[in-house]
Amino acid sequence: MNASEPTTADFRTCSDPVKWIDRKNVIIDTTMLRDDDGWWYRASKDSEITIERTRNPYAVAREVLRTDDPNEWSFVGTLTDLLGNGRYSEHYLEGPELFVFNDDDVATVNGRPMRYGLMCDQYAEGKGYTPFRSADLGSRDPLDWAAADDIDFGRLKKRHGAILPITEAEYEAIEDTFAN
């Protein structure tokens, strides 16, 4: 199944689409995040929630593989590999969304500050998003990954969407504006 990417500089015109993910299995959802160290990370819903990294986000990924070439997409792992729970497979999760936590929201787990977040929609069970934390998105060490069971989304189920970190002051301004 192919995923194509057009590019735009003005959001009025787009380039012709080019293959971006060209694999035999289905890819239905993909999210990307650029880290301060210049690496791009991507989480995709294929047969698992698959995590990859590259320095060239335009590289075409033809198969899931580990490579030392920084200009190709290199396989980091799947949520099942990293967290060891079969309920993280294609049958349970989709809609991954990567993000960076605000400094005040970074939790320490296993003695490691977990700066990054990954949310996935538990579509098969109709439960909405389930959150995860990572100290290092490029790490295959299970100690750098954890389920974020302490995050409370309230009663309203959260489904496919985007994460926009805001400060406490921004949150309060939104609350004040829309309180009534």
Can you annotate each of these PLM segments?
Residues 1-180:
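Carbohydrate-active catalytic/glycan-binding domains of CAZyme proteins
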